[in-house]
Amino acid sequence: DGFKTVFTTPTALVLTIGFSGFIFVITGYMTWVPAFLQEEFGQTQAAAGFNSMFWTYIAAFAGVLLAGTLSDKIAVRDRKVRMVIQGVGLILGAAFLFFVGGNMALWTIYLCFAGWGFFRAFFDANIYTVLYDVTPARLHASCSSALITTGFAVGALAPVILGAMKDSMGNLSATFPVLGAVWIVCGILMLIVSRTHYQKDYDKINR
């Protein structure tokens, strides 16, 4: 019932697509950014592992607190804003990925990591609130399982796909714009559906 509900409810379906793209990019980032820092900047494994995560998660900590508070305040007047915030977060986060692969100073790369982490939190903060807005309470756990299973199945492909791209292109720099494009597409889809279906799907289960 969880999969059926998620895949037949437009808002939940697009949320799942967005979540799949979200996890795909995060998995690709976590897998390959340490290697990128080692190859491009000569960092040790320990330094590359630390720098790939530290700047991102420090910024994400601030981002998730801001996004959660902002969503709760605005959603009182217009609940679809939660999905709007998710879509905007993906699009703005994607912008930083396009710069990571460029020929920039290391400190600028770290700023991009932080910017990406800050805006990814806008998606994080609203995942389950959006899902539960448009799915029946009796199926919340089943729908969550469907969303998570689908997202992780798609995300698991990222290391292989990016690895194949690296082999064909000779470096990792070209993979970051691809990750950015994934988030932009997902973000646009979420903005569209938040406007066309969110309230309708909410009303169906809250009559």
What label would you give each PLM region?
Residues 106-122:
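Hydrophobic core of transmembrane alpha-helices in multi-pass small-molecule transporters
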Residues 7-65, 120-124, 128, 158-159:
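Extracytoplasmic gate region of multi-pass secondary transporters
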Residues 16, 49-50, 87, 141-145:
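Conserved glycine-rich helix-kink/hinge and helix-boundary motifs of the Major Facilitator Superfamily
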Residues 96, 100-102, 177-207:
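Multi-pass alpha-helical transporter architecture, strongest
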Residues 132-169:
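A late C-terminal transmembrane helix in Major Facilitator Superfamily
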Residues 44, 81-84, 164-183:
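A membrane-interface helix-boundary motif in multi-pass transporters
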Residues 37-38, 70-71, 75, 162-170:
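Interfacial helix-cap and linker-helix signal at transmembrane-aqueous boundaries
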Residues 72-89:
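Cytoplasmic membrane-interface "Motif A"-like loop-to-helix N-cap segments
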